[in-house]
């Protein structure tokens, strides 16, 4: 029941006491009434309390060592990158807490957005995901290659913010303190010398569009996504406290670093500094190299923290398979244990899985698919074979030369 009179009885709001003649609308419940003004006031109170809860959470940000401990539980290797990320994330949320709790403007703390550079499968996305999970903040992933500047067919940059809002269950206050990871950022680089005629002409435009939300702005986001339309209802979100982490492989950037350092082909009379491999060059990257690769100076300036990740070696991939809390070997052992079957991987089998991932140039992200290929038939048959007690995965099984070894009761 809503609106004016019922059986000629005047209705009053049970909360403020105003009559139906004094307000726009009164909503009826079970022997209780509430007016539109009290509904609006209630929404505002709830909104403020939610914001206070978010702020209270941020006052207890884990210290860098604590963040590193969490990362070490899930991420193998990349020690320098993990330390850099731990410090940057701690400083970012400390800045948010500091800014929200102070009324004066004596100190203007800038955002510590992060650029991660590393090959495919080195753990860039997983690092960002793990940080967001450990902080219990909303997290969203976007692919830079799907974004376009205004006027092109594709996805508006504001849709990245919509993903974060959705991850926060449309709680804008929580979303405003979340983390966004933008992958493949190197694919929208504006090429420097020897520009290819096939390069993405909108790459620089996308950087400019991303720049606005990364540096901090109040953005209007279509609640259903897609392009903006006149008279469309929008969600307003302030991005000044959203942590942006962008990542990419930046294939070939080590050559730019070599040129800057004056490295040449080793020959007689040359006194150049010796660096063992490309991984060492990755640790030498500075903003000048990134600009030469094709990111615009303004964009680079909003990414003060640069974390370089190394190509994972066979030993790293074996550790990833076995050591973390969510290690793949542990996951598949748990799956088979539900059928009462023990699962064992030979050491040579683990080495073969890691070698395959390196050969395919997929890094850590390719490990699961290799195990799936190896165990598909086994996982299909095992539930129907009640006499099987143990499965042993051998090197030959990984290489497709034989089937896994089965032990029966």
UniProtKB/Swiss-Prot annotation:
UniProt keyword Repeat present: no
Q: How would you summarize the oligomeric state and partners of this protein?
A: Component of the ClpX-ClpP complex. Forms a hexameric ring that, in the presence of ATP, binds to fourteen ClpP subunits assembled into a disk-like structure with a central cavity, resembling the structure of eukaryotic proteasomes.
User: What keywords are assigned to this protein?
Assistant: ATP-binding, Chaperone, Metal-binding, Nucleotide-binding, Zinc
Please, which domain of life does this record's source organism belong to? Bacteria
What GO terms are given for molecular function? ATP binding; ATP hydrolysis activity; ATP-dependent protein folding chaperone; protein dimerization activity; unfolded protein binding; zinc ion binding
Q: Where does ATP bind?
A: 119-126
Is Nucleotide-binding one of the keywords? yes
Gene name of this polypeptide: clpX
Query: Biological process GO annotation list?
Result: cell division; proteolysis involved in protein catabolic process
Protein name per UniProt: ATP-dependent Clp protease ATP-binding subunit ClpX
Its function?
ATP-dependent specificity component of the Clp protease. It directs the protease to specific substrates. Can perform chaperone functions in the absence of ClpP.
GO cellular component terms, semicolon-separated: HslUV protease complex
Organism (species): Streptococcus pyogenes serotype M49 (strain NZ131)
User: Which positions in this protein are listed as binding Zn(2+)?
Assistant: 13, 16, 35, 38
The family annotation for this protein states: Belongs to the ClpX chaperone family.
Mind telling me which PROSITE patterns this protein's record contains?
CLPX_ZB
InterPro entries recorded for this chain? AAA+_ATPase, ATP-dep_Clp_protease_ClpX, ATPase_AAA_core, Clp_ATPase_C, Clp_protease_ATP-bd_su_ClpX, ClpX_bact, P-loop_NTPase, Znf_CppX_C4
Q: Name one Pfam family in it.
A: zf-C4_ClpX
Q: Where is the ClpX-type ZB domain?
A: 1-54
Q: Which CDD domains match?
A: RecA-like_ClpX
């Amino acid at each position: 029941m809503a609106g004016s009179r019922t059986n000629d009885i005047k209705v009053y709001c049970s909360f403020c006491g105003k009559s139906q003649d004094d307000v726009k609308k009164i909503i009826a419940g079970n022997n209780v009434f509430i007016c539109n003004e009290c509904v609006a006031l209630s929404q505002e109170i709830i909104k403020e309390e939610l914001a206070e809860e978010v702020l209270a959470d941020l006052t207890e940000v884990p210290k860098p060592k604590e963040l590193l401990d969490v990362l070490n539980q899930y991420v193998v290797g990349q020690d320098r990158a993990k330390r850099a990320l731990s410090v940057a994330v701690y400083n970012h949320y400390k800045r948010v807490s500091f800014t929200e709790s102070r009324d004066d403007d004596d100190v203007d703390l800038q955002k510590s957005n992060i650029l991660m550079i590393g090959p495919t499968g080195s753990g860039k996305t997983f690092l960002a995901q793990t940080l967001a999970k450990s902080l219990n903040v909303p997290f969203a992933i976007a692919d830079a290659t799907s974004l376009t500047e205004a006027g092109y067919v594709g996805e508006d940059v504001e849709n990245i913010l919509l993903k974060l809002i959705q991850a926060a269950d449309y709680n804008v206050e929580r979303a405003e303190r979340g983390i966004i990871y933008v992958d493949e950022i190197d694919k929208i680089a504006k090429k420097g010398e020897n520009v290819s005629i096939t390069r993405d002409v909108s790459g620089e435009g996308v950087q400019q569009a991303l720049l606005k939300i990364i540096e901090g702005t109040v953005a209007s986001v279509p609640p259903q996504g897609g392009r903006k339309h006149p008279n469309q209802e929008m969600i307003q979100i302030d991005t000044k406290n959203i942590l942006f982490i962008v990542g990419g492989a930046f294939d070939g950037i080590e050559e730019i670093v070599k040129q800057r350092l004056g490295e040449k082909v080793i020959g007689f009379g040359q006194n150049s500094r010796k660096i063992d491999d490309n991984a060492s060059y990755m640790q030498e990257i500075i903003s000048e190299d990134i600009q030469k690769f094709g990111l615009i100076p303004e964009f680079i300036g909003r990414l003060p923290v640069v974390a370089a990740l190394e190509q994972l070696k066979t030993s790293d991939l074996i550790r990833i398979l076995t050591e973390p809390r969510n290690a793949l070997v542990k996951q598949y052992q748990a799956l088979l244990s539900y059928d009462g079957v023990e699962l064992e991987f030979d050491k040579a089998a683990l080495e073969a899985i890691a070698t395959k991932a390196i050969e395919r140039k997929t890094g850590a992200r390719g490990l699961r698919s290799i195990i799936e290929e190896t165990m598909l038939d086994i996982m299909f048959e095992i539930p129907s074979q009640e006499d099987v007690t143990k499965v042993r995965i051998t090197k030959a099984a990984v290489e497709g030369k034989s089937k896994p070894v089965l032990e029966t009761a």
